[in-house]
């Protein structure tokens, strides 16, 4: 766990933070493998006359994408569990007036294609369950005070051959300057020996030597939603063992004014709001065009196809879409791209690509946030769609709808038969405030 060693030493001299050494194992609830994680961010939530959110900060991390057991790396670790993969990191928690009733740490995992997950951890689980402090003796404290970057042998001992060679070691040229090779100087039957200084055996050890032999306590904790597991590591030699952490209790009146689930509640309220606005926008667009819409996607349908069913499919597709709306939705990803591009960010889509939510009305399921490519057929000016792991255009599937949103917030709600309701979604100041708070896009 060199990552924990490095940051434990770094934050010790930086001061003002508590190093929370954690490992994120491969979990069935995560959307992808741990080696697919592109970046990690964290923020803290503290009580300061209300819920106070710190800014998002980027974390450096190490990925172990193989089977690993803590005892194979740390011989005195108290865990025998085998993990199929780990993400190793250290979260620097600022030292403030802690209120363990509601204080928390939010860990954001960013995957390819704007897929992300947030893990909310209680500060109490990260700090207060640590083992009791065992102050090292004065001798051991002196031994580990050296720079851990200095490399030494494990036992600091020399073999007899090495000690013998040291006796004949001398600085200077290999041969005296006046020696002519091939001639034997008279009177010099034996080579002149210059004994080197007496070899002094090193007895001091270094933090890098003792770090992997110390006692380590590993404990699994669950996040706020009881969904994800995180392993917290407490090291015997970590400087945090000597830190005095105080908990400030909240009064009954203060507890009534705060909500420990504020992070999720604000997100769910916004999802309900934007989902309702998208559906309202689709209905108003249909009314503006006098309930007429054109075929935009290449799709064959039977002669006895009933156009009266389209409005029923539209209502059914809207219900399925908003029922389980998540932050992986195409409208969320499109807004992230739109605001990020305005702030000088890069484009996540090619010119012929959009974000899409694919709605299967026959199963009542939705695939959110797919990257969709539009292919124009010049013979009929109709589009076909293509995506990974899909053999044919989504519009060719029976009883299926789709919502497509471009990076310019151009919106298409596609009904069976390839008919589309087209418009452009407009942002409000509330949208910008939410995305700045939730994703740090300011």
UniProtKB/Swiss-Prot annotation:
Membrane-traversing stretches: none
Any Pfam family hit: Herpes_UL17
Keyword Transmembrane: no
Subcellular location: Virion; Host nucleus
Superkingdom field: Viruses
InterPro entries: UL17-like (IPR007640)
GO biological process: chromosome organization
GO cellular component: host cell nucleus; viral capsid
Assembly and oligomerization: Interacts (via C-terminus) with capsid vertex component 2/CVC2.
Stated family: Belongs to the herpesviridae CVC1 protein family.
UniProt function note: Capsid vertex-specific component that plays a role during viral DNA encapsidation, assuring correct genome cleavage and presumably stabilizing capsids that contain full-length viral genomes.
Protein name per UniProt: Capsid vertex component 1
UniProt lineage: Viruses, Duplodnaviria, Heunggongvirae, Peploviricota, Herviviricetes
